[in-house]
Amino acid sequence: MPSKPAPAGRSTAVEDYLEQILDLINTKGYARVADIAQGLKISQASVTNMVQRMDAEGLLKYEKYRGLVLTTAGETLARNIMQRHQLLTDFFRMLGISEEVIYHDVEGMEHHISPQTLRAIEALVSELQQNPRLITNIKSHTHGS
């Protein structure tokens, strides 16, 4: 089920951090400030400030020099963000969009798309998966542009 876009009180930056942290935990087993900074291409000082803020908001637990872990609320939110990201990525791949364009478009859309639109895309992806011929027809129209 698609997740909600970032509410007014939560910045897209917080969502980017959560997504990065969960990805690191899933791939490396842990997330450190240095790894988050490298993944997001920002300074460690900026990451430390945001991590402390997210700790205060109850999204993660941070201990200086020891790393961090997501709280249940933080992990749930991060998983929803990743599912939203994956749904959009899968949809654009079905349409034959290049990986570079997909990355750019998904990063631009994922925090701002409404739950209603996500549900519609999810339904469309399901229908397209059941009708590969339709995907071929769509690709023939989009690759000519």
Predicted regions mapped to residue ranges:
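Short, Lys/Arg-enriched N-terminal segment that forms or immediately precedes the first helix
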Residues: 1-9
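N-terminal helix-turn-helix DNA-binding core of bacterial DNA-binding proteins
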Residues: 8-42
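Canonical helix-turn-helix DNA-binding module
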Residues: 33-64, 68, 72
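Residues within the alpha-helical elements of helix-turn-helix
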Residues: 39, 77, 94
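Helix N-cap / loop-to-helix initiation motif
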Residues: 43, 96-100
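Basic, amphipathic "hinge/linker" alpha-helix immediately C-terminal to the N-terminal HTH DNA-binding motif
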Residues: 66-85
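A generic alpha-helix surface/boundary motif
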Residues: 85-87, 103-104
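C-terminal regulatory/oligomerization modules of transcriptional regulators
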Residues: 107-145
